[in-house]
């Protein structure tokens, strides 16, 4: 896009994934990056202060804990599920419901090979811009995105957390206490076949996208 005053904006869209034959970029695209005054992303991956601020937003201040913000039954369900993932209660209790829900949702779509993949498009462009000494900008901040989650109502955060648990737990092997805790928050439909089928379909769709990213031949 050209604003008529000689300022040209190039928009490179992606869903943070790539494909095997994408690199190296076409020379025309490389030239656009290397001749830019600034390269802007959704977030600035290089801003460590923002990353630390976002991390701090996910935990409670001293004297407060997760147990004070969700039902006792759901709290026990979270502690038990987290223990299976190698997290002790002391660690889990520091995190807010939305932060744990995000983590559980991510875990539901990852496997042991997910971290072995080549960088995605945005990280590639970011590295190229930094190496060329080009300024990095961002449309949003980590604090802005964190604030969206942090201002969710307590009721919504509890539902979000219960929903995250539902993604990572096997409904056929969980304890009755955990089932009751999730049902109390999510309702009787949570364990109905139609709901479980919808959850599995969602996970399958995300898994297919992740497989394409890992295989890099989408």
Question: What residues fall within each predicted segment?
Answer:
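Structured, acidic catalytic/metal-binding patches in enzyme active sites
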Residues: 2-217
